[in-house]
């Protein structure tokens, strides 16, 4: 399901409004009634002659890293006509409360859980985002939306102006609304820090889904417009660092891995201990067959695609992933 919205409207009304939007590919998923954290499905499209992978990513509300990692053998700028392009859409929701906004930094993705009205079924809406680059990390932790601004002006801090000046690209003290404003047409101010962090749009959609900002959360223009319309001031926001996510679905253990980032926002090597801890926690007291080599390979590939790495012992095809049977992994 795909869509667009407005502040105090019921969820169903919001979804219907989004479905008729000019570009309606923001992903809207009904939350599973059984509490499962897995939503969505993967799909694919054929590229047109004039397409780039970034064009396709924008069209289907995917980020830059997201689409290139899912299509490692496709040229980013010249995929060619008729090339099969995977659209990664199956996701394991980040752990924690399913409320407000959750931004998972390693995933370069934002999740919004609007409050359902009456008997409406709860949904999650998800968008790709850019986050802070090296030395300009996006802060982790709990915060909230404290203001919403249409047509924002940008007041680049002195540190940013200095950086641009050193690169031969001096900035004015104020950049007013318009096509040259990197904040785009909509911004939501967070309480984090001293209020300097925003969720905002962009005048450079090609860079959405990367680590390129000065700490803000950047979205496609259409996506931030849709989110701006439905998120009230006071909405809770959690910024998390969850490069490894696991979940049980139908007796299968899924692993989703993204390149981890450290406290400074830099990409670091995958941590096998984190993988082991996540899998052990998911197993609990249950008996399962785990394919540890496949789990480690999935961690190293870090392509963000949920992969079956284990089968519950009581599932009929428990031997499917040719695993080592046991919750313990002696080679960890």
What are these regions (language model features)?
Residues 2-12:
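Bacterial N-terminal signal peptides that target proteins for export
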Residues 13-14, 24:
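Cleavable N-terminal signal peptides
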Residues 28-61:
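Primarily a LysM-type cell-wall glycan-binding module
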Residues 48-78, 122-123:
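LysM (lysin motif) carbohydrate-binding repeats in extracellular/periplasmic proteins that recognize
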Residues 50, 80-85, 234-237:
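Loop/turn positions that initiate beta-strands
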Residues 91-203, 226-229, 257-331:
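Gly/Pro-biased beta-strand-loop elements
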């Amino acid at each position: 399901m795909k869509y667009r919205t407005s502040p105090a409207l019921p969820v169903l009304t919001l979804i219907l409004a989004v479905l008729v939007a000019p570009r309606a590919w923001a992903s809207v998923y009904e939350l599973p009634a059984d509490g499962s954290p897995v939503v969505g499905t993967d799909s694919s499209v054929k590229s047109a002659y004039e397409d780039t992978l970034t064009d396709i990513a924008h069209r289907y509300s995917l980020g830059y890293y997201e689409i290139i990692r899912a299509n490692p053998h496709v040229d980013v700028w010249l995929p060619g006509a008729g090339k099969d392009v995977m659209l990664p859409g199956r996701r394991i929701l980040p752990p924690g409360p399913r409320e407000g906004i959750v931004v998972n930094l390693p995933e370069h993705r934002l999740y919004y859980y609007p409050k359902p009205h009456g008997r409406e079924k709860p949904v999650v809406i998800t968008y790709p985002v850019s986050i802070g680059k090296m030395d300009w990390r996006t802060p982790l932790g709990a915060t909230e939306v404290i203001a919403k601004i249409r047509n924002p002006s940008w007041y680049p801090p002195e540190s940013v102006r200095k950086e641009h000046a050193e690169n031969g690209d001096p900035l004015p003290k104020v950049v007013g609304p318009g096509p040259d404003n990197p904040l785009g047409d909509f911004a939501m101010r967070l309480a984090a820090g001293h209020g300097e962090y925003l969720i905002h749009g962009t005048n450079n959609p090609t860079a959405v889904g990367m680590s390129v900002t000065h700490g803000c959360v950047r979205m496609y223009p259409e996506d931030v417009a849709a989110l701006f319309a439905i998120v009230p001031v006071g909405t809770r926001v959690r910024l998390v660092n969850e490069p490894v996510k696991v979940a049980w679905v139908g007796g299968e253990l899924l692993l989703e891995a993204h390149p981890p980032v450290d406290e400074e926002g830099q990409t670091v090597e995958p941590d096998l201990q984190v993988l082991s801890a996540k899998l052990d926690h998911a197993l609990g007291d249950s008996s399962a067959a785990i394919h540890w080599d496949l789990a480690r390979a999935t961690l190293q590939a870090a392509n963000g695609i949920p992969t079956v790495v284990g089968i519950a012992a009581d599932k009929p095809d428990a031997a499917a992933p040719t695993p080592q049977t046991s919750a313990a992994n002696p080679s960890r």
